[in-house]
Amino acid sequence: MKKVKIPFDIMKEIINDYTLNNISVPQLNKKYHYSNTVLYRELRENNIQIKSFEEASRKYEINKNIFKQITEQSAYWMGFIVTDGSFQKRLNTYQLVIHLSNKDDNHLKKIREFIQPNVKITYTKENSCRIAFTSNEICNDIWKYGIGINKTKEVNLSECLIYNRDFWRGVVDGDGYLGYCEKGNNKHRLEIVGSYSLLSYFVEYCKTIIPNFKNTVKPHKSIYVIHLGGNTAKTILKSLYENSNIYLDRKKEKYEEIIAL
């Protein structure tokens, strides 16, 4: 069988698409109508380095350094990832995936702005939205702080997160309930669900705000819950949300509403 050779002018376009426009080989296949085998061979013969699966999966360049240091944003988003994020593996490449209700799509736009502003948000027929970032380095950096691949199991948080209000605000925005009762003294309410270890760490954080904090973690169906009420809830909520710069809009609005009571 005669060896297929791509014409020089077309090959220049292919190289440009592959190296500068980050178009994958399967996409080049559809665009130029050459098989993957031919495309890979021609790229190698033109001394073009073949991308890893991670690089090929990433349409846009990601800031890989964002979780290497603890900032208000990085701590907050790790807290939110603990509750509403997941890590998905394909071959040897990991994706950080966040899946929310459509009503919170603006929050996905916030994390997109933080990590990579051009990544696409996808919407489903089930009134949900999703964003995914492909990067082994970002995932590994998050795991180093004690947030595991399987977040439903116990976590082993680094001390820099245990006592970090931005991290816990992210957790509350993800799996917390803020409310109030019209009657009684315990008007303010804060509830968080999660694993036993995660909520135990939250107790440790609360003790730095209220030294005689006595609330305990209790079983709740297949997971655990902690309930805070009255001035305790109000004090902890103020420690989390007051003068903060990153938050889930509707949770911050609820905080402002109940803190005024």
Spans of features found by a protein language model:
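Internal intein/HINT superfamily modules and their associated LAGLIDADG
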Residues: 1-261
